[in-house]
């Protein structure tokens, strides 16, 4: 049975049993700062389980795409080397929100496995939590499973909880027995880690709420959360022991072999590539782009790990993006969003491949040289240099070291990273601790109507932990029952301001969401003392709020203007709105032309001058979308949404704060347009007084340039062009002089050539020359010395440039490429080329003299 058939049978089975089929949510979870990626089927229903959201159904079924690579759930280092580890996988799940409980959950699972999937009953085992007599009774007396195949587990493996506090409950897991020919013991035994018994389905019974003291309280409406890995059940149905042998992976592994030229389909690198194309393609489909932090950096790590495994197979050209078509063929029908994003996915992956190719070979040279010097442990400073200079994620370096039988000095790397962070830390912005545990009332937001409101302190956090009070100088997070402070969301920065009480003043530096409707006010107690329960006056910084409103409303106008000028393919891919500026990322396949930027800028300013009323209204999500309101990337919307419109020009779903009339914005200037990834552009802009100040600064700079050029401002461009023409002429003359200088140096250097076994060998450094002159000088030496080996080096901008040449009569024994690599490794580089001529670069100029001295010995050893 194919993977696609299993997926569809699962959805159909539960739909016939009253479940609503809910599409997979994106891999970027909405409104959950504790998660990098969606890593289980229940993630999109988390607020339902917590009682913070209500759906129009009480039974649901889904096939959820998931990623585990980064954060708490990180399987990356095992992927490709084990039978069942993946970065991307599909979780089949059925859910009950206060409807059916243990009995139906167990009976549904048993019926599906033994009915539509036709798995023999005697191949299935079950586990229950040791104290869960109710579940055990259902298995024994209703399912009629043999008592010998029911195991009670006393460990936490069979008791699930969402966090230290909150919903939790016992589990019942279902295992498949591959038979006695496979090593391993049943669940709960000492050799349970073997491959004979494989867990295929986990049924979680959420029946308790754990309070801060650890005590369990029965939930009024117990719920069910189940999860079955599609890849695992497919392996069972297709009678294979490794997930990489199922139909879905066979197609991708064969495709990876095709594009890399690898013949051995069991090669682990092919498994890595096949796994990683799924994770990368779906992450990009869901709006993640390669970057240097957060989700973007995890994507970059996965991408570069796949590229390196291709390099390991001998594929030096871009290849990874070629697998997207094969992936769409396999999974596009189940996930039409992947098919729709195919061109964008290919473009993003290809760009990242090209970017990494620029440093991969040189980085590998540094790594190989370091591994050759060190026995088992790669020093932390080398790991950091590979990360910082060559773009090698630390786990990629660890992968390579492990393949060589060694490891990395992670502590040394972290020390280097800490030193870099200390150097870079300038802003000192307070950052909310991720994952603050909170159980209590939500925060009531009043910030649309007022900037000041009376409130009471519900909870205080200091250094990530709950405290009863804080004192002057303490950095803390304050949760209020009511607040006018806007919490960071939808790209808009959180408000700043102060909390005033009779006993202290708390300076709020930032406001962020701890949970969907719980606001954390982060900052420092400037004076006095605050205690849980204190009455405070919450006062938002009015200047920062209004400036942020200018920028947020301008962002809406910008979005609409881009769609009008560039086309309706433009969609928001990310944004940042604060008091100082706005940044807007959008889908577009090419850089904007100067005239397009001006058109967009003019259109936004025209809408500002029209002074539209900025209207807001609440309506049903479906109705808002029908009326043309744009839903934004990365946002999670409830059934009722807030719609912000400016005349008939812009209508968006938005929970942010805005001006009352578009004319309040005053003035809009685009200050930068750039690319952030393939198919994604970024505009940075200013509004109001900041835009005016920027314009005046530009005028001042133009006047300064004009003064230097001794020209009127309107003549500055022509005068500058004339100056540049003169500079180019001077540069040509310098090149001629350099060639003459090199010729003079070569006349004296040629006498330094030594003879080794009848061959003239010359290795020398030249001063004040560029690569072109090096090449010309090399050709001159080869012509004059006849049968010879020549290596020339020079230092420019603190970097080494090398070139090697071997006359044609010697290339059967001596290769210029081998020679240049030998020399380059000594100066921190790597190179390559033809047998008769090769080039390289390096980063250790002080090693150049010694490296050149070693050439004669290399020639003698290789003759």
Swiss-Prot record:
Subcellular location: Cytoplasm
Top-level division of the source organism's lineage: Bacteria
Cofactor binding comment, as recorded: Binds 1 zinc ion per subunit.
Catalysis: reaction(s): tRNA(Ala) + L-alanine + ATP = L-alanyl-tRNA(Ala) + AMP + diphosphate
EC number: 6.1.1.7
Cofactor(s) needed for function: Zn(2+)
GO biological process: alanyl-tRNA aminoacylation; negative regulation of DNA-templated transcription
First-level EC class: ligase
Principal subcellular localisation of the protein: cytoplasm
UniProt keyword annotations, A-Z: Aminoacyl-tRNA synthetase, ATP-binding, Cytoplasm, Ligase, Metal-binding, Nucleotide-binding, Protein biosynthesis, RNA-binding, tRNA-binding, Zinc
UniProt cross-references to InterPro entries, sorted A to Z: aa-tRNA-synth_II/BPL/LPL, Ala-tRNA-lgiase_IIc, Ala-tRNA-ligase_IIc_anticod-bd, Ala-tRNA-synth_IIc_core, Ala-tRNA-synth_IIc_N, Ala-tRNA_ligase, Ala_tRNA_ligase_euk/bac, DHHA1_dom
Cross-referenced Pfam families: DHHA1, tRNA-synt_2c, tRNA_SAD
Residues annotated to bind Zn(2+): 552, 556, 654, 658
GO molecular function, a single term: ATP binding
Keyword Transmembrane helix in annotation: no
GO cellular component: cytosol
CDD domains linked: AlaRS_core
Function: Catalyzes the attachment of alanine to tRNA(Ala) in a two-step reaction: alanine is first activated by ATP to form Ala-AMP and then transferred to the acceptor end of tRNA(Ala). Also edits incorrectly charged Ser-tRNA(Ala) and Gly-tRNA(Ala) via its editing domain.
Free-text note regarding domains: Consists of three domains; the N-terminal catalytic domain, the editing domain and the C-terminal C-Ala domain. The editing domain removes incorrectly charged amino acids, while the C-Ala domain, along with tRNA(Ala), serves as a bridge to cooperatively bring together the editing and aminoacylation centers thus stimulating deacylation of misacylated tRNAs.
Stated family: Belongs to the class-II aminoacyl-tRNA synthetase family.
Protein name: Alanine--tRNA ligase
